[in-house]
């Protein structure tokens, strides 16, 4: 009888240890999800040479930002945002006709895997961009080049950044990190 009670005691200890190990493992996994976009440029992201990019294809609209390792498709609507970036208010501008060409993408979107989090957080490092950085946009089978001339932060209610413009410009934006 005494040995049976001791075994039950050990089973309880093993169960507690197993639960603790599982909780630590889950915590480490969640931490990996949270930090994956910040370490991606160091580990996963290959440098982008804008001059070596394949020729723009008809029907494939892309935005390439070498400084932060972004090479993603963009399009109209929320579905496009889930695939890469959203072209906001297409009627207000595009690379070919000018106006305010507005592109928005997620800054941070946690996903079930670290690679998924990286892929769904293309503008995570948007704050690392600098004046003079180049941006390449493929639109309607042609390639357009932009250079950053102004960087500023806006509040979520400052929608004037999407306003129509006589000046041909590209506006990039994303939400701030929590």
What does each model-identified segment do?
Residues 25-178:
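Solvent-exposed, non-transmembrane regions of membrane-associated and secreted proteins
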Residues 1-13:
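N-terminal Lys/Arg-rich, disordered targeting/topogenic segments
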Residues 13-24:
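Hydrophobic H-region at the start of alpha-helical membrane spans
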Residues 5, 15, 38-40:
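Serine/proline-rich low-complexity intrinsically disordered segments, especially terminal tails, linkers
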């Amino acid at each position: 009888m005494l040995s049976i009670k001791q075994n039950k005691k050990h089973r309880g200890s093993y169960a507690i240890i197993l639960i603790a190990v599982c909780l630590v493992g889950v915590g480490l996994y969640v931490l990996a999800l949270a930090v994956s976009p910040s370490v991606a440029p160091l580990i996963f992201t290959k440098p982008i040479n804008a001059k070596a990019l394949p020729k723009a294809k008809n029907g494939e609209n892309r935005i390439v930002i070498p400084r932060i390792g972004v090479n993603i498709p963009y399009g109209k609507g929320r579905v496009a945002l889930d695939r890469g970036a959203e072209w906001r208010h297409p009627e207000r501008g595009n690379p070919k006709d000018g106006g305010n060409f507005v592109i928005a993408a997620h800054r941070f979107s946690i996903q079930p895997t670290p690679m998924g989090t990286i892929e769904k957080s293309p503008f995570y490092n948007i704050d690392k961009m600098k004046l003079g950085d180049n941006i390449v946009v493929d639109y309607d089978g042609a390639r357009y080049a932009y250079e950053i001339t102004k960087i500023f932060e806006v509040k979520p209610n400052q929608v004037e950044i999407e306003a129509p413009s006589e000046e041909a410009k590209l506006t990039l934006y994303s939400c701030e990190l929590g």
